[in-house]
């Protein structure tokens, strides 16, 4: 996501955010990273984050979550990483809960998380249904 990063202006030259998409920064972040010669990170918090209960991440409905998933699905086939895959899987499960639509994910035999193990056993559609059923009884607060 774009909000917690510092960029050189020239990285954005020729790039545009997609019109009409929520989470639009997720669509161009891979392109920005591909233009970088160096990426530096720090574990030190350098700003104060404000959790906006009315912000897009807290109020995202089906269309917004679908936009987020589609942005990640463009990148997922190129990024062979179990942790990233588990995050995208969680987004796909959220999209199903909000829309009832199953969006196919590329097949990887990851088994880092319980959800990934269950995905490999029963498939995405049944995992979506199971996840939604379980959330009727148990849901972590966001």
Predicted regions and their residues:
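Extended hydrophobic/Leu-rich segments
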Residues: 61-62, 83, 118, 137
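Structural motif
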Residues: 78-86, 122, 142
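Amphipathic alpha-helical repeat scaffolds of TPR domains
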Residues: 86-95
């Amino acid at each position: 996501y774009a909000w917690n990063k510092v960029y050189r202006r020239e990285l954005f030259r020729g790039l545009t955010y997609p019109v009409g998409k929520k989470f639009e920064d997720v669509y161009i972040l891979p392109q920005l990273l591909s233009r970088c010669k160096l990426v530096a990170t720090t574990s030190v918090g350098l700003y104060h984050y404000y959790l906006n209960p009315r912000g897009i991440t807290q109020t995202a409905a089906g269309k917004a979550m679908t936009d987020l998933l589609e942005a990640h699905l463009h990148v997922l086939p190129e990024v062979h990483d179990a942790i990233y895959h588990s995050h995208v899987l969680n987004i796909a499960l959220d999209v199903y809960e909000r829309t009832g639509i199953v969006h196919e994910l590329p097949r990887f035999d990851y088994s880092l998380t319980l959800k990934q193990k269950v995905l490999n056993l029963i498939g995405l559609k049944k995992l979506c249904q199971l996840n939604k059923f379980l959330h009727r009884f148990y849901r972590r607060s966001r």
